[in-house]
Amino acid sequence: MNAANRSRFVYVTFIRTTPPNLWEALTEPQFVRQYWFNTTVECGWKKGSPWKMVRPDGSLTDTGEILEIDPPRRMVIRWQNEWNPELKAEGPSRCTYELDPVDSAVKLTITHEIDRPESKLITAVSGAWPSCLSNLKSLLETGEVAITTHPGH
C-alpha cells in the first residue's frame, strides 16, 4: 500500500542509558508495568511469539505477534487493539521499535502505522505513546515515572 493510504505516528526520544538496559525496560514485564500505567507485557520475545498487553484485572488492551526481533536493536510487532471496538475494527497495525546508541544515550524511535488513511487508531496511539515513553525515559534516568495517571483512561 502506498504512503498516501497509510496512517503513521513516529516518536523519537533520547534516553541516557545503554541499548541492553533499554531493551530490558521494553521487554521485562515488571519494568513495563512501572511506566505503562500498571499494564504489563506477556511475550516469548522470539519471531512468531504471541504478544499481549495485560491490565491488572487480566483484561487485554492489545494483542499481536513478534514479526521481527533483533535484541537490543530492533523489534516489529503486529499490534491489534482489544479494548476499544472502534479501534479494534480497523484491524492490526504495525509497531517498530528501533534502538540506536548515540554518545551516552540511546535514540529510541517508535513507528506505529496502519494501512488505512485517517486511522482513529493512529490518532489514539499518538496521544498514548508520548506519556508512556516520557515515563520510560524518566524511570530509566531518575528512577521515577513522570506521569502516574494515563491520559484518557
For each of these PLM feature ranges, what is it?
Residues 1-10:
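Short acidic N-proximal helix/loop "leader" segments that mark the beginning
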Residues 10-11, 30-63, 149-153:
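Short beta-edge strand/loop motif at the mouth of beta-sheet-based domains
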Residues 13, 63-68, 93-100:
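Hydrophobic/aromatic beta-strand elements that line small-molecule binding cavities or substrate pockets
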Residues 16-34:
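Amphipathic alpha-helical segments
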Residues 19-20, 67-74, 98-107:
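A short, structured loop/turn motif at beta-sheet edges
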Residues 22-23, 32, 51, 66, ...:
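Hydrophobic pocket/interface hotspot
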Residues 84-130, 147:
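Beta-strand/loop substructures that line and gate deep hydrophobic ligand-binding cavities in soluble
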Residues 138-153:
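Short, highly charged C-terminal tails/helix-capping segments
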